[in-house]
From Swiss-Prot:
CDD domains: PseudoU_synth_EcTruA (cd02570)
Homology family: Belongs to the tRNA pseudouridine synthase TruA family.
Single annotated GO MF: RNA binding
Membrane-traversing stretches: none
Protein name as annotated: tRNA pseudouridine synthase A
Species of provenance: Xanthomonas oryzae pv. oryzae (strain KACC10331 / KXO85)
Keywords: Isomerase, tRNA processing
Major enzyme class: isomerase
Length: 257
């Protein structure tokens, strides 16, 4: 039987989502598979909606797995969470259709990046916030970001290690706002390139400080040259909010579009 899980994790202590082999360092995937396999009393493999890098967090990562073990969804949720490290928790578990796929059934994916914007570095929440001491104009960042909307070639914002076959993505929404001392960037797209959100944020920061004009982002997008864009923002400020699926899959409301 196929199940879908919603998984929350603090990525600070992991080398990313993906299991990278025996000597690849701790991963969220390896921890989750070990816990599920213990509950199932048999090997379990999971497929996720979107892989995250080292230090990046997950608010509602969605995975699917198959198992012949007879367990109620609540049993999977509680039993698996009890076997996971404190930095990972299963938020929900539901039966899924046999043809549901955590990655390929997703219609969109959402990320949030949070920057503490003040002169003094953070003592609290430093694992879940990035820090920028220079004053940022969040309104200018928001205006500049709107140039990225729609289906475009995002070569200027992909990492050199990106293995995607092409750089075209459909960026459906991007919003920048200030909430007290925090500047927050929320992004939604059909899919993302490696480091795409962090590279966008790194470039928007240069607009926010006034080092670059608002129309610079549009120029970067058109130029498709990663070497002239801003630096990659640090990983700790980034959270994978989660994917969105059509209602036909009958998943919880937070991941249904």
């Amino acid at each position: 039987m196929r199940y879908a899980l919603g998984v929350e994790y603090d990525g600070s202590e992991f080398q990313g989502w993906q299991q990278l082999g025996e000597h690849g360092g701790p991963s969220v995937q390896a921890s989750l598979q070990a816990a599920l396999s213990s509950v199932a009393d048999a090997p379990v493999q999971v497929v996720c909606a979107g892989r995250t890098d080292a230090g990046v967090h997950g608010e509602c990562q969605v995975v699917h797995f198959d198992s012949d073990a007879h367990r109620e969804p609540r049993g999977w949720m509680l039993g698996t969470t009890a076997r996971l490290p404190p930095s990972i928790a299963v938020r929900w578990c539901v039966p899924a259709a046999a043809d549901f796929h955590a990655r390929f059934s997703a219609r969109a994916r959402r990320y949030r990046y949070r920057l503490l914007n003040r002169q003094i570095r953070p003592a609290l929440y430093r694992q879940t916030l990035s820090w920028e001491r220079r004053p940022l104009d969040a309104d200018a960042m928001h205006v500049a970001a709107q140039a990225l909307l729609g289906e475009n070639d995002f070569s200027a914002f992909r990492s050199v290690q990106c293995q995607a076959l092409h750089a075209r993505r459909n960026l459906q929404a991007i919003h920048v706002q200030r909430i007290g001392e925090v500047v927050e960037v929320q992004v939604q797209a059909n899919a993302f390139l490696h480091h795409m959100v962090r590279n966008i944020v790194g470039s928007l920061i240069l607009v926010g400080t006034g080092e670059q004009p608002a129309d610079w982002i549009a120029t970067l997008l058109a130029g498709r040259d990663r070497t002239v864009a801003g630096p990659t923002a640090p990983p700790q400020g980034l959270v994978f909010i989660g994917p969105l699926y059509p209602a036909e899959w009958h998943l919880p409301a937070e991941v249904t579009q």
